[in-house]
């Protein structure tokens, strides 16, 4: 009765930037939910609509392959993050991000984000970018190659050991 679902093709069909999605909500919330959804996915051009239909109606084996690749990379990034002194990561259940706990490193989320970018050339997002409760966390993406993930986490591990994190 109070559930609103807003979704799209960005992650499932790797159609980021196409700005196509949908909303499902109870009739009594339709006006408010439409206002919320209208700026996200309105005025979608015909070519994008046809591409979205093709994605839905076409073979789904590539979606399954993509999901399996993300699971493999997710497992890799969580396993390797948990080997880094001062960091720990839970197994995420959605999207393609992990949010490792970095509190034992004694660095703030912003300090960690800056250090990783400037010292190691690894782009991350500070947990505080998602609100005050994100302090003590950093976001890693596993929407990258296994080789890049391995390289990045090996660099972080080496830095952590050399600088006595945790």
Give the ranges of each region predicted by the language model:
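PLP-dependent class I/II
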Residues: 1-166
């Amino acid at each position: 009765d109070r559930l609103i679902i807003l979704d799209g093709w960005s992650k499932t069909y790797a159609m980021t930037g196409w700005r196509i999605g949908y909303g499902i909500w109870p009739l009594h919330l339709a006006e408010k939910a439409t206002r919320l959804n209208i700026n996200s996915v309105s005025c979608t051009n015909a070519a994008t609509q046809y591409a979205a239909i093709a994605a839905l109606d076409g073979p789904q084996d590539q979606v399954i392959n993509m999901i399996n690749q993300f699971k493999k990379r997710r497992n890799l990034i969580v396993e390797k993050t948990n080997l880094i002194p001062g960091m720990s990561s839970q197994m995420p259940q959605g999207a393609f991000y992990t949010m490792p706990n970095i509190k034992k490193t004694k660095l703030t989320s912003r300090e960690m984000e800056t250090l990783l970018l400037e010292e190691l050339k690894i782009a991350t997002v500070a947990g505080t970018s998602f609100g005050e409760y994100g302090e003590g966390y950093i976001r890693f993406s596993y929407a990258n190659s296994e080789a890049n993930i391995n390289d990045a986490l090996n660099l972080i591990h080496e830095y952590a050991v050399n600088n006595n994190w945790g």
